Each structure stands twice: as C-alpha cells, then as structure tokens.
Design a protein with these regions (language model features):
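Conserved glycine(s) of the Walker
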Residues: 16
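P-loop (Walker A) phosphate-binding loop of NTP-binding proteins
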Residues: 12
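Phosphate-binding P-loop
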Residues: 1-4
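Conserved phosphate-donor/acceptor-positioning beta-strand/loop module used by diverse small-molecule
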Residues: 139-153
Length: 153
C-alpha cells in the first residue's frame, strides 16, 4: 500500500476547484495545496519590486532572490510566506491577478514551481487544484478530476 496518495483537480478559472478541494481535504484530513496562491506569490513579488511580469529576463533572477514557503493552520488553511512574511492577503488583491497570470506563463516560473509542487506530493497525501495539475504537475495522481461549471451555476 502506498504511503501517500494524491488527488489532482483541474479546470478553468471560476469552476470551483478550490472550494471542492478544501471540502475534500477537510473530509479526508489531508493537505490542500492551492497552487494558484503560489503563482500569485511570485506575481506579488514581481509587482512589489516593479518588475515586468511578462519579461523572463527580469523574473528568472527574482526566483533566485526570493524564498517562498507555505504554512498551514490548524484547520488546514494555507498561508503563503514570501521571505518569511505572510502575504496571504496581499496576493488576493485585484492588481496581483494579472501579475500572477503573466508570471504563470513563463517557462522559468513553471519549472521552478513544478518541482516544489511535486515534492509536497511526495512527502504527504495531498489534494492540489489548479490548471495543469493532473496533466503536468501530478500526471500520476491517484485520482484526477476535471471540474467544469456553467455560467448559470
């Protein structure tokens, strides 16, 4: 029997991936990793330094300068830490969304975070939600869900 298992939830923005993942994680008492929050943290780092989030020549060096960590509270809530500071609120600001979207398209960022996300899944049972989770990040996940929702729902 495997020591750890992984669940991957893919789907478009606004489909309810995080809502479902949080509920399942709570029910199964496993870790929920919101991968979008990790990208938002890099976007926030770029924003706060005045960098062009579309310019890989600016973002690649940033990845070597910053320290990104995750902490989880007693309820399993994910906190994002940037250089030791909790930035969980800041990364949800509307102006950070575009930065997060832009940095997430950069190959250097995707490669940087890919290993981080896979390492988490190697060490613990997890449910991860985000785009490309079941195809790229956790292609061998024990359970893969592609979640969609209509505009009416």
């Amino acid at each position: 029997m495997k020591e750890h298992f992984s669940i991957a939830i893919d789907g478009p923005g606004g489909a309810g991936k995080s809502t479902l993942a949080k509920a399942v994680a709570k029910k199964l008492n496993i870790l929920h990793v919101d991968t979008g929050a990790i990208y938002r943290t890099i976007g926030y780092a770029a924003f706060s330094r005045g960098l062009d989030a579309k310019d890989e020549s600016q973002i690649a060096p940033l990845l070597k300068e910053i320290q990104i960590d995750m902490a989880f509270d007693e309820t399993g809530g994910q906190k994002m830490l940037l250089d030791g500071k909790d930035v969980s609120t800041e990364i949800r600001l509307p102006e950070i969304s575009m930065y997060a979207s832009n940095v997430s398209a950069l190959p250097c960022v995707r490669a940087y975070l890919l290993e981080m996300q896979r390492d988490i899944a190697r060490r613990r049972s997890v449910i991860m939600d985000g785009r490309d989770i079941g195809t790229v990040v956790l292609p061998d996940a024990d359970l893969k869900i592609y979640l969609t929702a209509s505009a009416e729902e």
